[in-house]
Amino acid sequence: MRILITGAAGFIGQQLLADLAVQQPNWTLFAADIREIPANLLRGNVHPLLLDISRRAAVLKAVAECQPQAIVHLASVVSPPPGMSEASLHAIDVDGTQAVVDAAAAHGVEQLIITSSGAAYGYYPENAEWIDEHDPLRGHNKFAYARHKREVEELLVQARITH
């Protein structure tokens, strides 16, 4: 199995990479991130890949070259560094996800896993205590991550129709 993991240097990405590298030693894992992958995660079946998810052409090229059977898309910005623009955040969170979806479709990727968040539903006091996929996606205007997760959910609905 060949797996491309975006956001592999992030918290969830590191955990997933560490577990898969040990539990599935015969799998080829492409650890993609704009940041360096920690050395302790670079086992024999892990191949680091410097990838800026906001660069559509780079995403398409990475998927074409890696030829993954599955993609686990974790790349996102939860807590942006000071000074990061809204446009940069959107380019990573939303446009980057669209690029991954399009690359997966273009190159026949069998499985595409994209993480979501309760943030897509927005943080509102009137929300039910328990929410599920039938509740409205509202994001939150004051929290870019929540807005972007809502947008990603919407683009995934379109992707399911298109692909």
What are these regions (language model features)?
Residues 98-145:
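Conserved Rossmann-fold NAD(P)-dependent oxidoreductase catalytic core, especially the SDR/UDP-sugar
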Residues 6, 32, 71-75, 112-118:
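SDR active-site strand-loop-helix element
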Residues 11-14, 94, 150:
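Residues forming the Rossmann-fold NAD(P)(H) cofactor-binding site
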Residues 53-95, 103-106, 123:
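NAD(P)H-binding glycine-rich loop region in Rossmannoid oxidoreductase-like domains
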Residues 141-163:
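Active-site Tyr-X1-5-Lys
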Residues 25-36:
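Conserved glycine-rich Rossmann-like NAD(P)H-binding loop of the short-chain dehydrogenase/reductase
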Residues 43-55:
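Rossmann-fold cofactor-recognition segment
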Residues 1-25:
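N-terminal Rossmann NAD(P)H-binding glycine-rich loop of SDR-like oxidoreductase domains
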